[in-house]
């Protein structure tokens, strides 16, 4: 039976509803259990009936159809996922529930429920699970859908135009989209689940509670930043738990940390991967600069040198910067003390810049991606070299020459589209009563899929519940746009893609 991809995804999420249902039974929350159990049953029944009616239908489109499925998943699936959430809470609107599910599915983690204690434990588990499945969905889609179409960052290194596949040049080697999707899923799903399980066990060993540990483990792997206790600063695992999570955050820097299925420029080794190297440079470079500022600020006020405070400050900066670079958004428990010690009262611009830069291509991280930043860096370096030596010839290899020329051009196009999207969304939010500064933060948070920026980037946290309904829908659009990226949306509108 050949079921459409959207139905398969719907069925997976319907089955996943029984996990919080079972958990709610175990904690004697029968009302919440019924909400998720019956929603899962209804979903499976609908998937079965629709599947039987379209079982023998041969899909007309290959890769373009799957790209359309990605868009439909992020837009329409939360309509179903929000039903048990609203029914379990009973004190929130359906729009708020839909917003929360879009935020979780796109791994943004924009928390519309400002008080964690307001939600039942099983609802916290459900939100983290939706984000975790959304992260797995993007892991698989990046390799099986976006890479063959030269989208999602792969347009920087591939020979084909964005939205077109290299396989078009060789019709005999055109891959079967469905078969590729199955192969990628069977290869990556066990890795994703195993890493999450390992992180969960390590957090429990560090002293964290089972529910909080599994929610944080899923949030780290999906880079969603969702927490049942409002952040890791209140976690029982302490600095040991932060160190463990820091290691797993590195999976958001480069796909080579867990797979080599999308190697396109010949950098099959992690130490030669430009994304990982530039990510490590930022992760350690920015905290060192902040640490030096901390130290100089302490000397200026003649403060007593305290080594433990200095180390705590450095660790708080190191973890928080890594978290926001990978678009997770967790703040270290030592981040606030580091700000107070250094006098750094407004670190929002640093966090906004890190989130915009983003993580690696084909990871769960959002942003503009490190590979595009690297391509523009190479291009700028080459242009400065030509200014000094106009007759010089690039000594880089063929792969880097590709990045310097066409790759940098496509990366620059993406940056312009990102800036235009940021401008339009900010204007649209401002039109519905959101102050300009808050509109900018919300737009960056949505487009970079870094929801915790809403609380961390401004002087005071932004209350999403006070926003008008149209503003919430605009922010939902921004989150979907940030997850799929503008080039993918434009590719869907291209007649050449569907004609091919």
PLM region spans:
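Membrane-proximal intracellular helices of multi-pass ion channels
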Residues: 1-500
